[in-house]
Regions:
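Arg/Lys-rich RNA-binding interfaces used to dock onto structured RNA substrates
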Residues: 2-153, 176, 287, 294-304
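Active-site/ligand-binding-proximal alpha/beta "capping" segment
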Residues: 216-270
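RNA substrate-binding interface of SAM-dependent RNA methyltransferases
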Residues: 4, 71, 102, 125-223, ...
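Structured adenosyl-cofactor binding patch, chiefly the S-adenosyl-L-methionine
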Residues: 124, 162-166, 177-194, 251-304
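Short, charged, surface-exposed secondary-structure boundary motifs
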Residues: 89-91, 113, 207, 226, ...
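Amphipathic alpha-helical repeat scaffolds
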Residues: 62, 151-159, 271-277
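Short, hinge-like loop/turn segments at secondary-structure boundaries
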Residues: 96-97, 122, 188-192, 233-235
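Short, acidic/turn-prone active-site loops that include or flank metal/cofactor-
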Residues: 84-86, 107-109, 176-178, 201, ...
């Protein structure tokens, strides 16, 4: 017969706590099995500029775009993933564990929500970058980009990507230019939508009233060669429609300041360059001149 423990003895140790099971990948994912799902309906509605403008949202289609947005710290409003081709262990699912609106979507429904010919594997609804004015950006710019009547969303998106990659301070959209948050523009920008300030609805007169910079306008003929122009000083590069050019916008931008017209030399009889290609060539020439002079642009490019 065992004796009872003495009054001074220590209590028996508590049994060790059971470890919590790890959270399974994709916990919290829901199945969107109906086209009436709110996130699917919103993704379809955001194909329209009016809805994008009212809601200040955009659609990113594909893994690369969603990854770029997440890398820039953008928090999605909703994440839609292909239930058959991706699954719950996708890294984008892990990166958005705190997001309530995450759905596994049958491919047929995901295709209906997308503007692509082939449905993406991942689609995210994202907040647009904040509305900006000239008070919010570097001014005068080392290099700013002004688009007047560039109506194709793909060209706008490509110019956003190029401007960000070549160190421009900002990109401003003038009258007649496509929405930089159009799905095609977002795809062409490949994540640069979140990397460079974008100013919307900037009339030439709004820019002309500001000082401290030169205007360099791209024209199809009659201008100086880009390497003959001073592209080192603070400047705004103005690009227009491929057919109509800058039109009257160049005169409005001048407003008493120096305006330099540049023309990229081409082979005889060749068609004019695509506006995105012309913009890339001119921005690259500005980078080259700055590198040779030892001056940097927005702090990311130096003479070396």
């Amino acid at each position: 017969m065992s004796r009872p423990p003495s009054r001074g003895s220590a209590p028996a140790p508590a049994p060790p706590a059971r470890p919590r099971p790890p959270t399974p990948p994709g916990a919290g994912l829901r199945l969107a099995s109906s086209p009436r799902n709110p996130a699917l309906r919103l993704a379809r509605a955001l194909q329209a500029k009016k809805v994008r403008r009212e809601r200040r949202l955009l659609v990113a289609e594909g893994e690369d775009l969603v990854d770029a947005a997440l890398a820039h710290g953008v928090e999605p409003v909703a994440l839609l993933i292909d239930a058959e081709r991706v699954g719950a262990d996708d890294p984008r699912v892990r990166a958005t564990e705190g997001l309530r609106e995450r759905y596994l979507v049958p491919p047929r429904l995901l295709a209906q929500a997308s503007g692509l010919a082939a449905a993406p594997r991942v689609l995210a609804i994202l907040p647009q970058p904040p509305v900006r004015s000239f008070r919010d950006v570097a001014f005068p710019p080392a290099l700013g980009l002004y688009l007047a009547g560039v109506a194709d969303p793909g060209n706008v998106g490509t110019l956003v990507r190029t401007a960000a990659g070549l160190g421009a301070d900002w990109l401003a959209l003038g009258p007649g230019s496509a929405d930089a948050f159009h799905p095609r523009a977002v795809r062409a920008a490949m994540g640069a939508t979140f990397a460079i300030p974008i100013l919307e609805g900037v009339a030439p007169a709004d820019l002309a009233t500001r000082g401290g910079f030169a205007v360099v306008g791209a024209v199809p003929r009659g201008g100086v060669a880009p390497w003959e122009a001073d592209l080192v000083r603070p400047l705004v590069l103005a690009l227009g429609a491929e057919r109509g050019g800058l039109g009257g916008a160049l005169e409005e931008l001048a407003a008493g300041r120096e305006v330099v017209q540049v023309t990229i030399p081409q082979a005889p009889g060749a068609e004019s360059l695509n506006v995105a290609a012309a913009g890339a060539a001119l921005m690259a020439e500005s980078v080259r001149q700055r590198a040779r002079s030892g001056r940097s642009g927005s702090g990311t490019l130096s003479g070396r």
